[in-house]
Amino acid sequence: MTQQSSNSAEPPLSFRVGDALVTRIPELRWTNADPARLYPDLDAAALGAYGSQLSAGSYNPDTGKLAQGTHSWLVRHAGRVILIDTATGNDKPRPSAPMLDRLDTPYLSRLAAAGVTPEQVDLVLLTHIHADHVGWNTVLQDNTWQPLFTRARHVYSETEARYAAALDGFAPAPDLPPADLGRADHPPMPQVYTDSLKPVIDAGLGQAIAIDGKEIADGLSFHPAPGHSIDHAVIRLRSRGEEAWFIADIMHHPLQAYRPDLRSVYCEFPKTAEQSRRGVLAQAAESGALCFSAHFAESGAGRITRNGPGFAWKFVNPKENSAS
């Protein structure tokens, strides 16, 4: 990701999954992400080979650039209002990532356009504790970071929280999870715990959990998919026989469905991230679940299918999903 797009308004896109309504809340869009920077092991010939299988809204063959974004997913289900990941947030100092540094976006207006105020959110579910997934947990008020979703229970990995707290000097470093994650290539950004999670915990709004697949609310569960971060999770929603998977940073672009071996520059433990990606791709292809991405452009939602020995990604639009 190399350049922030304009902050022009985007209409909310909504999908039906059983009795649940899932709505995208956009934050940022890029149309000129450099694939060589995002995927250090990718060569131009390989991109050209798969470019014909990527849709025009995700890859521009004339420029060789990728389209990406950041967004949240708003879920209305079983009488609850649920927000899955909270994007980057405004005013957050992120000097090591200029495209995320001290943003000023109309995210809250887009949430309002979807018919929800922060006070109406019951649950905030965090797939992992990275800057572009937890930022709107808090807002700057009187020079202090205050929780935005003041009625919501914020649910996240205990291991992720301890790891992030240690990074910011609030706790000793935790033991790694039992699985061997391999060598850490990319440390997480500092200060994310300080400005985006600790204020929530201090306000009594946090709930740290084990990522073990157990249901945490009606039809909602966290499933282990480590590697991109130390205890990264895929969140699954089951409703009336249908499934939605919120895959977060299992993939950063549809290209990785075709090339699951590609590591992103942002993955902390790339070998484990690849193993998790291959596992999620295989399970998603078998289940037929509707997958909701964290950084894909276009609708952000799609299905994974088998493609010879590998996989393919097909975007799903709300009209195509209307019968669900």
Task: Describe each region flagged by the PLM.
Residues E27-L28, T86-G89, I129, T159-E160, ...:
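Active-site metal-binding loops of divalent metal-dependent hydrolases
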Residues M1-V116, Q120-D132, L148-P224, E242-A248, T272-G288:
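Metallo-beta-lactamase
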Residues G57-T63, D142-N143, F222-H223:
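Short, P/G- and charge-enriched loop/turn segments at secondary-structure junctions
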Residues V134-T144, R303-I304:
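Metal-dependent catalytic neighborhoods of phosphoester/phosphodiester hydrolases
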Residues P98-T105, S109, H232, R236-S324:
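Cap/insert and terminal regions of metallo-dependent hydrolase folds
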Residues V134-W136, S221-A233:
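Active-site glycine- and acidic-residue-rich loops that bind
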